[in-house]
Amino acid sequence: MPSGALDRLMKLRDDPYAMARSWKERTGSKVLGFFCCYAPEEMMHAAGALPVRITGENRDISKSAAHLQSYCCSLARTGLDMALDGTLSFLDGTVFVHTCDTMQRLSDIWRLNAGFAVHADIIIPVRFETDSAWAYMIAELSSFKEKLSEFLGPIDDAAIIESIKLYNKNRALLSEVYDLRRANPEVLPYDQALWIVASSALMEKSEHNALVEEILSDLKEAPSPATDDRVPLFGIGSVMDQWEFLKMVEESGATFIDDDFCDGRRYFDTLAREDLPPVEAIAHRLWDRKTCPCKHAPSKERAKCIVEEAKASGAKGVIFFQFKFCEPHAFDYPHVKKALDAAQIPSLNLEIEQGSVSIEQMRTRVSALVETIKS
């Protein structure tokens, strides 16, 4: 009999920060928000805080328009709106990692207007794989550790190592969910698999680990479903929270078999080493993991990696989900698209924006891609 763990996680989608608010009320400890998956969550956790990811919201803007231009991405605009209208009032502070110009400037606006007790910026290098970039990354993470200590008290290296182990366990469990579904997409709707990953950054990791272990047990015990004849697709983008759209793709005769979303596989990609000093271990993971359009690593050329990953997943087509006014993904698209064309992998680029997705218009375009692949 199913444990109900998946149902408990899916209910969180209606109120993403419910677990964080409950945790704070229960423990009296601090909650720190972050936007980017390059944030060193293990350090925050080791300091006794709960790291919680801010992913914006599908909402109309009420307060942030006075601070941000209309050509900023909806992730920045809705995130700031949530801070200004009290939705994020449970936060004690926010950690910004440099990703793009919008987020870099949002950090200053946030610091001056959101009113949280602590504010930190981490400037992760844009270009990896040089000695100077490595030294700079170590210095930035060490500086962040010191700043956390000023706010939360001394952070013991042993505590960071334990947090690394806890987060590694979570990454391994999430990888198992994705790999299980890749082998048999019928076992779990894609939007639920993606939410299992996204919810990991919204609650205490030990609680999430327990729930995912139950979900995996349920999935492994479930009867084998019928053969899946849907077209397997690969998704590319930053944060993906357009759940109705993902369901629509499955209604169109396709399903996502894997992805390169920063709240999907890219979030749990690569374990941190447990045989190194903690700051180095965290730095190595950020250094070694899959890069996003905001970073560059010569040995992991992004277009080539995307093609290899799409092929390995068994995907027959690719859909790009590009936030309107997202410059990093806009610059990334032509290069990756060219590589996909050379590999004869059909693709579709969809512009999305939180709060204004036209499902039916996109349904027509997705159906056309599916029919093209089938033919």
Positions of predicted regions on the chain:
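A charged, amphipathic alpha-helical module
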Residues: M1-K30, I138, S142, E146-T270, ...
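Metallocofactor- and cofactor-centric catalytic cores in central/energy metabolism, strongly enriched
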Residues: S3, K11-E25, S29-C37, E41-E42, ...
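Redox- and metal-dependent alpha/beta enzyme cores, enriched for Fe-S-associated oxidoreductases
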Residues: R26, C37-Y38, M43-T55, G237-K311
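Short, acidic/turn-prone active-site loops that include or flank metal/cofactor-
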Residues: T55-I61, I123-R127, D260-R265, E353-Q354
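Short, charged, surface-exposed secondary-structure boundary motifs
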Residues: D60-Q69, E129-A133, R265-A272, S358-E360
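Glycine-rich, highly charged phosphate/nucleotide-binding loops
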Residues: L68-D85, K295-V307
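Acidic/His-rich segments in extracytoplasmic proteins that coordinate ligands and/or metal ions
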Residues: T78-E150
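TerminUS-proximal long segments
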Residues: A303-A310, A315-G317, F321-S375
